Amino acid sequence: MITGKIVQIIGAVVDVEFSQQSVPKIFNALKVDNQGSILILEVQQQLGSGIVRTIAMGSSNGLKRGLLVVDLEHGIKVPVGTATLGRIVNVLGQPIDMKGPLKNHDNSDIEYWEIHRKAPSYSEQLTSYEVLETGIKVIDLICPFSKGGKVGLFGGAGVGKTVNMMELIRNIATEHSGYSVFTGVGERTREGNDFYHEMSDSRVLDKVSLVYGQMNEPPGNRLRVAFTGLTIAEKFRNEGHDVLLFIDNIYRYTLAGTEVSALLGRIPSAVGYQPTLSEEMGVLQERITSTNKGSITSIQAVYVPADDLTDPSPATTFSHLDSTITLSRQIVSLGIYPAIDPLNSTSRQLDPRIVGQLHYDVALGVRSILQRYQELKDIIAILGMDELSEDDKILVSRARKIQKFLSQPFFVAEIFTGFSGKYVKLQDTINGFKDIIEGKVDHVPEQAFYMVGSINEVIEKSKKL
């Protein structure tokens, strides 16, 4: 047993001295008894003379110099497999849902994996062109997801990232038979609680593993909790399952890295972020991939500070994604939810060879009408609608109907909106927007398109107006 002693404590950073012959490796887990409770430290730096600098995976309150520290001689290990399904665990894999210890259904031994693992090699990786239906019109039409791909939900504060994330989980987890892993990185405890009950009410909790590191936790927890969730997802993938990995919020992972970097004494780079921002993001994102054994489809919420998409944190995330969904405050102000901006949202899947020519043409038609409407808005604001040509008047009418039709009542928001949730099949979505573009519903009033599912519901609603 290799032991050392604490020589310095600065908040979440703890320096530990070992003999020079037995200095722990980087990322090794150390154990210290802090007034009867076990605290885990993770080695971040070797300072020389046998001293290592560590980050505490919990509160450092109560620690003092001279306390005995034990090197566990491996990285942080967490439980993986079916024992985690339906349970909430923390960064160390310890259950925090007050349901007792984790156990496998067949009472077999629980397997433990280290959270620091190598990304799959190039020869093991697999790409898929299969489109994953979400039941949300604007996503399925404009920025379709690929099975085994990575999706980012970008948005500032209060534009609906978490609600969109919860709706996606509810829709995909209900329709999709595989396992899901939800990782809450530095988010509100209330949202975690809401999410747990939403999964329970939707009867999909027994297929979901929940890993939480809330915003009141020390930076070490928030920095590593994404790896805990990813490790659980990797286990399911390696067993041949198609896994959904939800991360809310990837920005908090970056922020925790910034805090840890400052505590470790590194000189900050642009906008105060850590100099290792790209590397830290890459280490996480490179492991989120599909292999010849199974797939991981990842959906990540990304907070955009001050609605600035050029901020280094969201900008670094962009390069790793297959689909980007941008939430717009301007669309929120129009009362249209989900507030997804169809002109700023993209997907590599929107290709006629993948989604088919009809889907591609309809998506492009919707975009071009909305783009032209955007250009005409200034003329309308200054001169009014009367100055537009007849063709432009028709185009504006269709654009406003498209805008309204892009709204959709969510299952997870029923309690707030009063509208019952709708799941819209991809074919119904394409047919609905095709009818608007071709002018088949020009006679239907604009209000009928708001907060409905398919185009048939629009016709029914218009009869009541």
From Swiss-Prot:
Annotated binding of ATP, by residue: 155-162
Subcellular location: Cell membrane
Pfam family, one: ATP-synt_VA_C
Assigned GO CC terms: plasma membrane; proton-transporting ATP synthase complex
SUPFAM superfamilies reported in the protein's UniProt record: C-terminal domain of alpha and beta subunits of F1 ATP synthase (SSF47917), N-terminal domain of alpha and beta subunits of F1 ATP synthase (SSF50615), P-loop containing nucleoside triphosphate hydrolases (SSF52540)
Classification via InterPro entries: AAA+_ATPase, ATP-synt_VA_C, ATP_synth_F1_bsu, ATPase_a/bsu_AS, ATPase_alpha/beta_chains, ATPase_F1/V1/A1_a/bsu_N, ATPase_F1/V1/A1_a/bsu_N_sf, ATPase_F1/V1/A1_a/bsu_nucl-bd
Record-listed E.C. numbers: 7.1.2.2
Membrane-topology descriptor: Peripheral membrane protein
Keywords: ATP synthesis, ATP-binding, Cell membrane, CF(1), Hydrogen ion transport, Ion transport, Membrane, Nucleotide-binding, Translocase, Transport
UniProt protein name: ATP synthase subunit beta
Organism (species): Buchnera aphidicola subsp. Baizongia pistaciae (strain Bp)
